[in-house]
């Protein structure tokens, strides 16, 4: 199975994971066809293991190797394609960012979806384990959803 591994919170806030080191780590765990994506903390691997097993293995290895409380999201590439294809807003609008937020906690997701947003400024929608969001470039951190996602209660769950 081909998987996408999304690392949360790397290469920000003092947690630095070089992609060459990540690739080496994933290869040392026995994964095949390992590819990393820029300095994003995202990787692709092939494994016969389940997504849950890959998640557990990678989190333990990251914690041991890099010394930070690692959380990862692991999805089959087909599942990620389905999520991306379901994006409900116009894509690629000039001057706008399109986001897919993977939400690990149902309560956090409910709070985000309950926000009263000015739809002329930003919009969000429910997805399967995700929140779809669109916001003008330059306004991400100052938008209502941006502020809510930056709160301490939300950070570990996005």
Predicted regions span which residues?
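Surface-exposed, charge/polar-rich loops and edge strands
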Residues: 1-40, 44-158
């Amino acid at each position: 199975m081909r998987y996408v591994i999304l690392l949360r919170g790397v290469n920000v806030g003092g947690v630095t994971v070089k992609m060459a080191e990540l690739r080496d780590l994933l290869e040392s765990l026995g994964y095949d066809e390992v590819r990393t994506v820029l300095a994003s903390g995202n990787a692709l691997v092939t494994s016969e293991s389940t997504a849950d097993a890959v998640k557990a293995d990678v989190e333990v290895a990251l914690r041991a190797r890099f010394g930070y409380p690692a959380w990862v999201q692991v999805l089959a590439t087909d599942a990620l394609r389905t999520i991306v294809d379901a994006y409900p807003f116009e894509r690629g609008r000039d001057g706008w960012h399109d986001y897919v937020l993977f939400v690990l906690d149902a309560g956090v997701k409910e709070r985000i979806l309950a926000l009263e947003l000015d739809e002329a400024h930003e919009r969000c929608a429910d997805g399967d384990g995700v929140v779809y969001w669109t916001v003008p470039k330059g306004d991400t951190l100052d938008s209502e959803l941006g502020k809510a996602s930056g709160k301490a209660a939300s950070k570990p769950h996005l």
